[in-house]
C-alpha cells in the first residue's frame, strides 16, 4: 500500500464525475475529439478535424502530443506532451491566451521514444 492511495482514490472519484465536454460561448473542450455523430470520443486517433464542420465553434482538444500548441481551422490542439517531459499547456478560448509550465518529471515515454530506445543498444 502506498502513501498516496487514499488521495488517489479521492481524486479518481472526483474526476469520474466530471463531464466529458466543457462548453462555453462559441467553443467546446474535450479530451480527444468527436465521433461521426458529434459525441465526445475519448480514444479517437484519426484527425477528426479534417471533417469537422464547425457546428460547436472552436474545439479545444488534447490527447495527441505535439511540440507546440497548434491550430487547424476551428481546432486548437493543446497537448504538448507534459507526461513525456514536454510542457503542460492550457488555453483560454475567451482571451486566446496560452499558459505553459514545465512538468516536474517524465512519467512515461512516448511511443516514438519507446521504439527508438528499443532499437538502440546502450553502449
List the model feature ranges, each with a label.
Residues 1-88, 93-116, 121:
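Acidic, His/Gly-enriched loop-helix segments that form or flank divalent-metal centers
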Amino acid at each position: 500500500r502506498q502513501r498516496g492511495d487514499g488521495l488517489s482514490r479521492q481524486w479518481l472519484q472526483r474526476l469520474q464525475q466530471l463531464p466529458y465536454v466543457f462548453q462555453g460561448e462559441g467553443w467546446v473542450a474535450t479530451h480527444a475529439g468527436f465521433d461521426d455523430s458529434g459525441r465526445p470520443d475519448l480514444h479517437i486517433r484519426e484527425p477528426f478535424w479534417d471533417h469537422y464542420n464547425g457546428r460547436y465553434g472552436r474545439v479545444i482538444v488534447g490527447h495527441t502530443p505535439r511540440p507546440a500548441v497548434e491550430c487547424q481551422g476551428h481546432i486548437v490542439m493543446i497537448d504538448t506532451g507534459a507526461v513525456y517531459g514536454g510542457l503542460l499547456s492550457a488555453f483560454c478560448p475567451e482571451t486566446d491566451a496560452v499558459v505553459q509550465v514545465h512538468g516536474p518529471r517524465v512519467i512515461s515515454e512516448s511511443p516514438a521514444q519507446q521504439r527508438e530506445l528499443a532499437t538502440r543498444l546502450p553502449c
